[in-house]
Amino acid sequence: MELNGAKILYTIHTNIPVLGDFKITQTLESTWIVMALLSALAFWLGRDLKLENVSKRQAAAEFIVERLDQFVHDNMGWHFDKFIPLVGAIFALSIGCNLISVVGLWSPTADLNTEAAWAIVVFIIIMYYKIKTNGILAYLKGLLDPIFLMAPINVLSEVSTPVSMAFRHFGNILSGTVISTLLYWALASLSHVIFGWLPGFLSQLQLFQIGIPAFTGLYFDWFGGCIQAFIFCTLTTIFIKRAAGEE
């Protein structure tokens, strides 16, 4: 049994100093597939919108938008509408990246780089609003409170926001992948122990691998994935709201 990270599929030799060659990994491949599917879904849901006699497709699209609006408003307030697309994009991409493993593709959220990229985007927005609200000098002065000796700790506290968000999401998704893999391997070993003494093809029966891994995959890929997407987006809205000086 082996547990490996995302494989490098292609390497584009650019010879760019410092950056080096551009590597296309399973993470990039799966992420592009998810983005393409989400774009196609958004295009399909947004076509031929009407004010009257709406179709079931339009009703579903309106329901999604209304729930997303309500989520952002409940966590941030009605004057933060401009963050609805950001939160919606992160939520949809997170769920899509989690669920793509159901069809056998590599889950981008099992790669820390994915969550780190989302967390960095959120961190930049948080820093922008902190500086916009308090001013650059007041923000830098705040890093010295209550005494200048606390500056390193305050800086670490700021940096810990994106780090904790990324590792929380990544750790939960990766743990689900590891548990599912270990369970599948254990069931294969159990099948071999029980049926291995039988003659012919009967010794190769993998009866215990039927059904049980599907239920664990259903939990970790569907339920657990949706929960982690919800938590990440909730933290995003709360941190941005606090950075803007809202309580």
Residues of each region from the PLM?
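Selective transmembrane helix interface/packing segments
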Residues: 1-247
